[in-house]
């Protein structure tokens, strides 16, 4: 009968709808590794001699004009210069570099700097972030770069999704090749980062400073599955830091969640993988 045919069509429609909703839900909670996304660990840096280093030179940014770096950071009490991340041969110029500069124990003088190529003031951006040094809180940092932008607009910093409008300029129009491994927590000399870092990601070839994209990466104020965002593509390189780490004794390996550029620890202990996360 017509009534029975309509009933069968309705039942079939319900089944299709349930299947589609189930598929959407499954996709929304799955990460690239096929597991539901969770963030329970970060990595502690003691500020004395602990850092991470890649086994080979990090060349993915060479020749690119755009890049975005995103990470969650808890800034410790650092004085003088400390490096959050760098690709820089010993004694040479850098492909890029993120560092902080402070003065003594005063929290009133603490700046974030981003460098390309040499240490000239013509190749850097800087901004005071004195209010968040050693405040005991997690902060989301984004550094968005487009070296083809007009002078003074090449770099934008975001802290907790708020634009910081750093001052500076960069003369290079592309990231130079200065062969060196990627270091996190160290650069040159006695310059070790003190604090904690989580979810360190690099997008090569993309400037994600559009506010909607910044908001999407920031999420709800805690770590987000960067490989499955709605409008932002997966990073080029992504280190979960504590989560997904392999620990053998006091040797820690931090795997790249996207590619194959893994990091290994220097002067760290197993307890530096800690249950302290944003949010």
Question: Residue locations for each model-derived region?
Answer:
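Extracellular glycan-interaction patches encoded by glycine-rich segments
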Residues: 177-198, 207, 220-226
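Short, aromatic/His-centered strand-loop micro-motif at the edge of beta-sheets
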Residues: 114-140
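Short tryptophan-centered beta-strand motifs in secreted/extracellular beta-sheet-rich domains
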Residues: 71, 136-147, 157, 201
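Extracytoplasmic low-complexity segments
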Residues: 1-49, 214-279
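Short surface loop/edge beta-strand patches of beta-sandwich-type extracellular domains
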Residues: 44-67, 124-132, 186-189, 219-230
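Short edge-strand/loop segments of extracellular domains
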Residues: 86-95, 154-164, 220-225
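Short, solvent-exposed beta-strand-to-loop segments that form ligand-recognition rims
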Residues: 159-181, 225-226
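Extracellular glycan-recognition modules
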Residues: 48-113, 148-154, 191, 206-213
């Amino acid at each position: 009968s017509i009534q029975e045919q309509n009933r069968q069509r309705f039942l079939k429609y319900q089944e299709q709808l349930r299947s589609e909703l189930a598929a959407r839900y499954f996709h929304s909670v799955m990460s690239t590794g096929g597991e539901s996304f969770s963030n329970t660990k970060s990595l502690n840096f003691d500020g004395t001699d602990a850092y991470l280093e890649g086994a080979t030179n990090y060349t993915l940014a060479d020749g690119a004009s755009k890049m975005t770096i995103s990470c969650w950071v808890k800034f410790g009490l650092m004085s003088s210069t400390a490096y959050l991340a760098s690709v820089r041969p010993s004694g040479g110029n850098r492909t890029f570099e993120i560092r902080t500069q402070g003065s003594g124990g005063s929290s009133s003088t603490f700046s974030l700097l981003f460098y390309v190529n040499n240490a000239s003031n013509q190749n850097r951006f800087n901004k005071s972030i004195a209010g968040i040094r050693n405040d005991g809180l997690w902060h989301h940092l984004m550094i968005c770069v487009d070296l083809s932008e007009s002078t003074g607009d090449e770099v934008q910093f975001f802290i907790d999704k708020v634009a910081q409008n750093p001052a500076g300029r960069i003369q290079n129009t592309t990231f130079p090749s200065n062969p060196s491994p990627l270091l996190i927590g160290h650069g040159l000399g006695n310059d070790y980062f003190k604090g904690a870092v989580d979810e360190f990601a690099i997008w090569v070839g993309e400037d994600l400073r559009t506010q909607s994209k910044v908001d999407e990466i920031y999420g709800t104020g805690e770590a987000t599955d960067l490989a499955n965002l709605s409008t932002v593509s997966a990073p080029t390189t992504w280190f979960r830091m504590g989560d997904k780490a392999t620990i053998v004794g006091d040797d820690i390996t931090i795997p790249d969640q996207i590619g194959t550029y893994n990091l290994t620890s220097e002067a760290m202990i197993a307890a530096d993988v800690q249950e302290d996360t944003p949010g």
